[in-house]
Amino acid sequence: MTVAREKLAGRALILGVNGQDGTYLARFLLGRGYEVFGGRRKGSSNWRHSLLRVVDRITYLNIDLSDPTSINEAVSRTRPTEIYNLAAESSVAASFEDPTGCVRTNAISVVHLLESIRSHAPQSRLYQASSSEMFGRVDIVPQTETTRFRPQSPYAVAKVSAHVMVQMYREVYGLHGCCGILFNHESPLRAENFVKRKITRGLAERCFAGGRPIKLGNLQASRDWGFAGDYVRGCG
């Protein structure tokens, strides 16, 4: 993809570009005149990008977040003005099945990324996607940026670690790193293993095809929900 340099608003590297949030963020930044580089796992599908008609406007990079060399190559090659880390193992349930893998993906990879930025793009601005799961068992409603973290899952612990690590690199090394604490947000691009898609797909199947029972997790959980397309505007 060729972009006229004089018209660029910035150069954005989006890690996790093929996910729900990455897709909406890519469209938003492209609309603002950015050159967008998309970091993705090798072999991952671009079906969301095809739906939003941005697949031909993104420069894709296959990045292994467990490999510091892979991250270094991506950052040094693109020299981004802004980096958005939306890549994560996003299933709380899956984090109990593989806590080590979750910590590796959601925490250690962030250290690799911060070190890469410090070495190859110290002037770039980093956005790290944090999660309301970090609050865990809460005593205060609603929560704020100063509410104490009480993580209740490997996923939440990993997210807290990444959140604090970005803070440390900002204060110790002077990197421009910030975290956005995201609460639940959905869209038609959400994967079907998440609760709202489970419910809507299950209802549709039962209405039209007499589908199977809908299996859900904790029915006592209470969450705020937003639209992913709105959330990424806050990120960008």
What are these regions, as identified by a protein language model?
Residues 1-185:
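N-terminal Rossmann-like NAD(P)+-binding domain of SDR-like oxidoreductases, especially those catalyzing
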Residues 139-142, 164-236:
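NAD(P)-dependent short-chain dehydrogenase/reductase
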